[in-house]
Amino acid sequence: MSTGDFLTKGIELVQKAIDLDTATQYEEAYTAYYNGLDYLMLALKYEKNPKSKDLIRAKFTEYLNRAEQLKKHLESEEANAAKKSPSAGSGSNGGNKKISQEEGEDNGGEDNKKLRGALSSAILSEKPNVKWEDVAGLEGAKEALKEAVILPVKFPHLFKGNRKPTSGILLYGPPGTGKSYLAKAVATEANSTFFSVSSSDLVSKWMGESEKLVKQLFAMARENKPSIIFIDEVDALTGTRGEGESEASRRIKTELLVQMNGVGNDSQGVLVLGATNIPWQLDSAIRRRFERRIYIPLPDLAARTTMFEINVGDTPCVLTKEDYRTLGAMTEGYSGSDIAVVVKDALMQPIRKIQSATHFKDVSTEDDETRKLTPCSPGDDGAIEMSWTDIEADELKEPDLTIKDFLKAIKSTRPTVNEDDLLKQEQFTRDFGQEGN
């Protein structure tokens, strides 16, 4: 058996022990605990990852302590049975229940500390420095987020009586259209505590721990409100219910539904912001909890033009406004991330020219006082046959970045979003959503 097999078998046996323990079948539970601990010990022995090893060790200790407690109880029960009547033995289960509750109270604080420690990395202590103006287009989505996030914090007196800010927003659309980037802008612009989590932060291999993580996440958000919980790829946690769904997945979904509903808690001041590429796979109950469902489509011409300008930034180039509009027109069907890839490739074209050049020539710099070498054609006046390895660092001038570099990059970079996916997104928008442009 591999390490994963030992761990899976150990968790299976320990879960059986927990179920028996809960049902007060302590003798069977004790045996199951020790059978499971044998496998966890083997998993611990062969596990190579230090973090996984620490987690297995902590769980091993926790279950070992419980098994030892059951052992003491069973020994005590046997001793009592020898001295007392059978009726006295029936009362011992009640005593054991009390012991279990006390143990839960003692360990509850420690467990919560561990869970909060695991979630601490989800809190963004430093703002990502992405402003609203850094997000090209998507004016509808930005206005919705300002209404839900900025206004309630800045003007709380506007939200009284039945006028309450939105508590759940779902951003959906094809991959690479800026959903996570919008979330970064929210984190920068909002004067709120920002929790950024994905399914990997909330799903645990240990039975019952995932729903505890969800509960603690919302508890931390309520303690630090105003706050925003951003769940990236929310579909991984809240897919459609079906026969193939695991019990663990159902419990996570149920806990998330309870927390988003705010049952038994004051959740005002907590916004849940979800992002997904496949909204049609969301469970209908979860979909309903997101009061606003905003479609983040592929960028239009104006947005694509702006994206080229933003991605080029302050890199030296000779592109004009008309050149940027041309590039925007040529990239219809490209997502924001596709355009970022195009620009990245184009920015490397001058470097590739340097690497492949066989001739260089002298050119003047902006101050006209120094001369530098730049790649050229062998037929150019003043061309010197040499390689870039023959040139000192302060003597080299990279070629100008031109629209030709971008045209070459566009030819080699195809859009990643297909027509079928867009049709599904548009159908979902007609059925359940609203446009983000």
Curated annotation (Swiss-Prot):
Result when mutating residue 64 to D: Inhibits membrane protein sorting to the vacuole
Extra facts: Present with 5350 molecules/cell in log phase SD medium.
Q: Where is this region: Disordered?
A: 74-114, 364-384, 418-437
This chain's protein is named Vacuolar protein sorting-associated protein 4
Q: Where in the cell is it found?
A: Endosome membrane
Q: Which organism is it from?
A: Saccharomyces cerevisiae (strain ATCC 204508 / S288c)
Q: Which UniProt keywords apply?
A: ATP-binding, Endosome, Membrane, Nucleotide-binding, Protein transport, Transport
GO terms (BP aspect): autophagosome maturation; autophagy; endosomal transport; intralumenal vesicle formation; late endosome to lysosome transport via multivesicular body sorting pathway; late endosome to vacuole transport; late endosome to vacuole transport via multivesicular body sorting pathway; macroautophagy
PROSITE patterns referenced in this protein's UniProt entry, alphabetically: AAA
Q: Which family does it belong to?
A: Belongs to the AAA ATPase family.
Record-annotated residues binding ATP?
173-180
User: Transferase: present as a keyword of the record?
Assistant: no
Show the InterPro entries listed in the entry: AAA+_ATPase (IPR003593), AAA_lid_3 (IPR041569), ATPase_AAA_core (IPR003959), ATPase_AAA_CS (IPR003960), MIT_dom (IPR007330), MIT_dom_sf (IPR036181), MT-severing_AAA_ATPase (IPR050304), P-loop_NTPase (IPR027417)
- Which segments show compositional bias classed as Low complexity? 82-98
Domain of life of the native organism: Eukaryota
Its Gene Ontology molecular function terms? ATP binding; ATP hydrolysis activity; identical protein binding; protein homodimerization activity
Biological role: Involved in the transport of biosynthetic membrane proteins from the prevacuolar/endosomal compartment to the vacuole. Required for multivesicular body (MVB) protein sorting. Catalyzes the ATP-dependent dissociation of class E VPS proteins from endosomal membranes, such as the disassembly of the ESCRT-III complex.
Q: Does the keyword ATP-binding apply?
A: yes
**An example Gene Ontology CC term for this record:** cytoplasm
Its predominant location is: membrane
Limits of the MIT domain: 3-80
**Basic and acidic residues compositional bias: what residue ranges?**
421-437
How this chain assembles, per its entry, is: Monomer or homodimer (in nucleotide-free form). Decamer, dodecamer or tetradecamer of two stacked respective homooligomeric rings (when bound to ATP); the dodecameric form seems to be predominant. Interacts with VPS20. Interacts with VTA1; the interaction requires the dimeric structure of VTA1; 6 homodimers of VTA1 appear to associate with the dodecameric VSP4 complex. Interacts with DID2. Interacts with DID4. Interacts with IST1; IST1 competes with VTA1 for binding with VPS4.
Q: Per UniProt, what is the membrane topology?
A: Peripheral membrane protein
Annotated SMART domains: AAA, MIT
